[in-house]
Amino acid sequence: MTAFSAHKSQDETAAIRNVETGLQEAWNHHDAKAFASFFTEDADCVNVVGWWWKGRPQIESKVADSHVFMFRDSTYTNDEVHIRLLTAQIAVVHVRWSMVGHQNPDGAPGQPRKGIQTHILQEQEGKWLIAAFNNTNSVPEVSFPTGARKNG
């Protein structure tokens, strides 16, 4: 890797990290328009329950709807961000996140949550944007059961 490409890589990583920070800030300000602005116009977003939203307008609308009640008092935190540049214009990002302050659909306070997101980012005209977003809740990892082996 040349000094130039190493420097460019550091610049790109910093720019991508700014996207992740901006996404967190937009969520915590309950600003769906700002949240959606970090996505490409034709982005795909799959939320923690598997709902698939297509395109920036739908992402903005669904995030706005979710913040009317369930997430209006939520605080979302990027606990760990791992960035991997695949090419000069494509990156994959894994975000370990946590959330407090949300409500369950029945109105009861939600328990603190943790999860992992996978983002595919694409550089468009000098700006990094999320082209694909997949979110999942996580549970503590446990050992796989060994069980009895079957012969035969």
Give, region by region, the residue ranges found by the protein language model:
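A beta-strand edge to alpha-helix "cap/lid" segment located at domain peripheries
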Residues: 2-37, 44-152
